[in-house]
């Protein structure tokens, strides 16, 4: 713990976790539904345990006990948390963030100097196997609304700001920002793979130049500064009080842009009962992803939009209980409704 406290990342993560905890409890009191209670405590638990205690206390403590000195413990630690002199605990325990934050949101375990096969396998399984399967059943919100640390802050600290998200066709054009960032990560990935596979060839050298140029490149204009720090951190959080807590998630997150593709094949829907809809527009107003929920409800058709993160605000705010989370079959027929009650 002493070595962890010496790291700036420890204090950043501590403050982040405390904010999620405090504002999460406030959210539970503000929205006393079964769904919000389970969702919020899940977000708090994930932020507190695997995203804070694990890298900054549990793993360093196990290392001090000698659990990673020999045997299978050392084999596992060497594969996931390499020994380093540049990180106070002696191993790169911060890479444990990659157990929760999938590529390309957390890209540092993939974009390494030498290939780390364990993390490459984990990242492939996370991003291209587990996420598509989970989203197929529960929608994009299974990750954005229940697991991701960005979503945790948005649903807790940003909960009272959700009505500030701009709506309308022009806002959808801003989604290209996330698509562009996703394209950059794919270019980075391809360049990194070519440089690994052909290190001594002109193709490998050229790919390596592209990789370093985009990732590190011009100071303050590189991917690591512009996207990872400015857009996701400074701008994303700074705009909470102007355009809601989901600015980064909706417009700029490269992982969300990828999951939008997966979500188009999802069976998750917000089921609407047209007979009960009074066109009050409350459901659309509280959507911090900019979805025209009322437009679907007025027509009595299930809400189908890849932007939905299952926050449940529209379901809870509806005064006539028009909306419910559910699942449809291939023909669009409702086959299942969520067991967790999202209305008061």
Descriptions of predicted regions:
Residues 1-301, 306-307, 313-316, 320-344:
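Non-ligating segments of multi-cofactor redox enzymes
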């Amino acid at each position: 713990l002493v070595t962890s406290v010496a790291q700036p990342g420890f204090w950043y993560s501590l403050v982040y976790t405390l904010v999620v905890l405090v504002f999460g409890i406030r959210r539970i009191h503000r929205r006393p539904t079964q769904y919000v209670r389970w969702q919020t405590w899940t977000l708090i638990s994930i932020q507190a345990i695997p995203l804070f205690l694990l890298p900054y206390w549990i793993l360093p403590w196990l290392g001090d006990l000698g659990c990673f000195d020999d045997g299978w413990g050392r084999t596992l630690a060497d594969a996931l948390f390499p020994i380093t002199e540049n990180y106070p605990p002696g191993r790169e325990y911060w890479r444990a963030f990659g157990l929760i934050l999938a590529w390309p949101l957390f890209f540092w375990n993939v974009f390494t100097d030498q290939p780390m096969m364990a993390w490459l396998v984990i990242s492939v399984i996370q991003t291209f196997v587990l996420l598509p399967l989970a989203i197929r059943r529960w929608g994009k919100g299974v990750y954005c609304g229940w697991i991701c640390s960005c979503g945790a802050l948005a649903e807790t600290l940003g909960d009272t700001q959700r009505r500030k998200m701009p709506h309308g066709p022009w806002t959808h054009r801003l989604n290209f920002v996330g698509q562009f960032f996703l394209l950059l990560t794919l270019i980075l990935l391809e360049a990194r793979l070519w440089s690994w596979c052909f290190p001594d060839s002109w193709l490998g050298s050229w790919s390596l130049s592209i990789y370093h140029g985009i990732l590190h490149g011009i100071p303050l204009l590189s991917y690591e500064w512009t996207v990872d720090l400015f857009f996701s951190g400074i701008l994303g959080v700074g705009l909470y009080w102007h355009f809601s807590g989901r600015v980064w998630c909706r417009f700029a997150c490269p992982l969300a842009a990828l999951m939008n593709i997966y979500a188009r094949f999802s069976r998750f829907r917000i089921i609407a009962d047209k007979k009960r809809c009074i066109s009050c527009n409350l459901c659309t107003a509280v959507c911090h992803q900019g979805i025209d929920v009322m437009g679907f409800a007025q027509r009595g058709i299930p809400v189908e939009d890849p932007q939905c993160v299952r926050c449940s605000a529209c379901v809870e705010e509806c005064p006539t209980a028009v909306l419910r989370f559910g699942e449809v079959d291939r023909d669009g027929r409702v086959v299942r409704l969520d067991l967790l009650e999202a209305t008061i």
